[in-house]
């Protein structure tokens, strides 16, 4: 992937939850957004008030959980991703 994230931004590929096996079809606006994803790219981090870099704690390949309405959806190379701040991520699988 040729996409460099800036600052403390994280590019996430949403992992679909298997709750859509129901015969009842819901409109897109009523469906629950995924809250689990795989980290595809990370920025270098953010700077504190002294100008020191605070490095990211996440790395490419990490599986994370994030707030349901966090980030912005983007499309790159015909694939949909979510861009969010590292602080919007609430947990990482270990």
From Swiss-Prot:
UniProt entry keywords in alphabetical sequence: Chaperone, Cytoplasm
Keyword Cell membrane annotated: no
Main location: cytoplasm
Subunit structure: Heptamer of 7 subunits arranged in a ring. Interacts with the chaperonin GroEL.
Descriptive protein name: Co-chaperonin GroES
Recorded family membership: Belongs to the GroES chaperonin family.
Organism for this UniProt entry: Ehrlichia ruminantium (strain Welgevonden)
PANTHER family reported for this sequence: 10 KDA HEAT SHOCK PROTEIN (PTHR10772), 20 KDA CHAPERONIN, CHLOROPLASTIC (PTHR10772:SF63)
